Amino acid sequence: MPRSLKKGPFIDLHLLKKVEKALESGDKKPLRTWSRRSTIFPNMIGLTIAVHNGRQHVPVFVSDEMVGHKLGEFAPTRTYRGHAADKKAKKR
């Protein structure tokens, strides 16, 4: 269910400060964050944000199609390695 339009988009203040600081300094290093719940704003376009997935920080390069989505959508938390193979089928 989307957030109410009356409330507006959410972004953590500490992440917003990091983004503004990176934009004014022109720094291209990835910004490390644990804030998966923050919405991607238009001023983040062109930055690389390292989003924590529970184990490591996944680098996410922000493009214009990502605006309005959450950072956590681009850093998957679960790895699927496939189901166990059938041992009977391998013997044949």
Swiss-Prot record:
Gene3D superfamilies: 30s Ribosomal Protein S19, Chain A (3.30.860.10)
InterPro entries reported for this sequence: Ribosomal_uS19, Ribosomal_uS19_bac-type, Ribosomal_uS19_CS, Ribosomal_uS19_SF
Ribonucleoprotein among keywords: yes
Biological processes annotated in GO: ribosomal small subunit assembly; translation
A matching Pfam family: Ribosomal_S19
Annotated keywords: Ribonucleoprotein, Ribosomal protein, RNA-binding, rRNA-binding
GO CC aspect terms: cytoplasm; small ribosomal subunit
GO molecular function: rRNA binding; structural constituent of ribosome
General function of this protein: Protein S19 forms a complex with S13 that binds strongly to the 16S ribosomal RNA.
NCBIfam families assigned: rpsS_bact
Family, as annotated: Belongs to the universal ribosomal protein uS19 family.
Name by which UniProt lists this protein: Small ribosomal subunit protein uS19
Organism: Erwinia tasmaniensis (strain DSM 17950 / CFBP 7177 / CIP 109463 / NCPPB 4357 / Et1/99)
Gene name of the record: rpsS
